[in-house]
């Protein structure tokens, strides 16, 4: 009887003779023919990763992409090293590493924190946007919420001519950028 096992174009079978179908991940990418396995490190969606032998996850906050032999290190706020052939699916949400991966949890460096909500002026709270959080961390930021600033209000009458005691507003960063753009200084 002829063996059809390792012929090109033939159907791959598992150890029990059952046909193996091509498997795809949630993004439609083929998961490879290496089967399943932890590959020595923990995947980011659970206790085990899907071993592909040739693909792993790259670096970054979301961690999508491919690495050499499945080795990669997360460089976001919480990154995880993977073992050989481990594959990353989903966002990096684990806080512990299971197995013999390359690295553990990467700790945040730097100082300072920003609250995720602020007073809305009506006795309640509202969530801050990412741009507001970034602006708070920049040097020269002055919190203007809850403070009414009267700039350029009434003059003394003598300064109405324009010379002498003109009061200039401090320009914001966006105003400075707009001035440098062609046609933006109107």
Curated annotation (Swiss-Prot):
<feature type="compositionally biased region" description="Gly residues">
    <location>
        <begin position="152"/>
        <end position="164"/>
    </location>
</feature>
<feature type="compositionally biased region" description="Basic and acidic residues">
    <location>
        <begin position="133"/>
        <end position="144"/>
    </location>
</feature>
<feature type="compositionally biased region" description="Basic and acidic residues">
    <location>
        <begin position="165"/>
        <end position="186"/>
    </location>
</feature>
<keyword id="KW-0346">Stress response</keyword>
<dbReference type="GO" id="GO:0005507">
    <property type="term" value="F:copper ion binding"/>
</dbReference>
<dbReference type="Pfam" id="PF00257">
    <property type="entry name" value="Dehydrin"/>
</dbReference>
<feature type="compositionally biased region" description="Low complexity">
    <location>
        <begin position="105"/>
        <end position="116"/>
    </location>
</feature>
<dbReference type="GO" id="GO:0016151">
    <property type="term" value="F:nickel cation binding"/>
</dbReference>
<dbReference type="GO" id="GO:0009414">
    <property type="term" value="P:response to water deprivation"/>
</dbReference>
<feature type="region of interest" description="Disordered">
    <location>
        <begin position="1"/>
        <end position="186"/>
    </location>
</feature>
<dbReference type="InterPro" id="IPR030513">
    <property type="entry name" value="Dehydrin_CS"/>
</dbReference>
<dbReference type="GO" id="GO:0009961">
    <property type="term" value="P:response to 1-aminocyclopropane-1-carboxylic acid"/>
</dbReference>
<dbReference type="GO" id="GO:0005829">
    <property type="term" value="C:cytosol"/>
</dbReference>
<dbReference type="InterPro" id="IPR000167">
    <property type="entry name" value="Dehydrin"/>
</dbReference>
<feature type="compositionally biased region" description="Basic and acidic residues">
    <location>
        <begin position="89"/>
        <end position="98"/>
    </location>
</feature>
<dbReference type="GO" id="GO:0009737">
    <property type="term" value="P:response to abscisic acid"/>
</dbReference>
<protein>
    <recommendedName>
        <fullName>Dehydrin Rab18</fullName>
    </recommendedName>
</protein>
<dbReference type="GO" id="GO:0046872">
    <property type="term" value="F:metal ion binding"/>
</dbReference>
<dbReference type="GO" id="GO:0009631">
    <property type="term" value="P:cold acclimation"/>
</dbReference>
<comment type="similarity">
    <text>Belongs to the plant dehydrin family.</text>
</comment>
<feature type="compositionally biased region" description="Gly residues">
    <location>
        <begin position="30"/>
        <end position="85"/>
    </location>
</feature>
């Amino acid at each position: 009887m002829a063996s059809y096992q390792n012929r090109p174009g033939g159907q791959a079978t598992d150890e029990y003779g059952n046909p193996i179908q091509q498997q795809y991940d949630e993004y439609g990418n083929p998961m490879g023919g290496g089967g399943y396995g932890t590959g020595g490190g923990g995947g980011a969606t659970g206790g085990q990763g899907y071993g592909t032998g040739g693909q792993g996850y790259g670096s970054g906050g979301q961690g999508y992409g491919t690495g050499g032999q499945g080795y990669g290190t997360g460089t976001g706020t919480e990154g995880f090293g993977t073992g050989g052939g481990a594959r990353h699916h989903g966002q990096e949400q684990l806080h512990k590493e299971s197995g013999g991966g390359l690295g553990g949890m990467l700790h945040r460096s730097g100082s300072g924190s920003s609250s995720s909500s602020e007073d809305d002026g009506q006795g309640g709270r509202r969530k801050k946007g990412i741009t507001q959080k970034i602006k708070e961390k920049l040097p020269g930021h002055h919190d203007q919420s809850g403070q009414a600033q009267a700039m350029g209000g009434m003059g003394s009458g003598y300064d109405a001519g324009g010379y002498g005691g003109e009061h200039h507003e401090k320009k914001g960063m966006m105003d400075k950028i707009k001035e440098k753009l062609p046609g933006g200084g109107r």
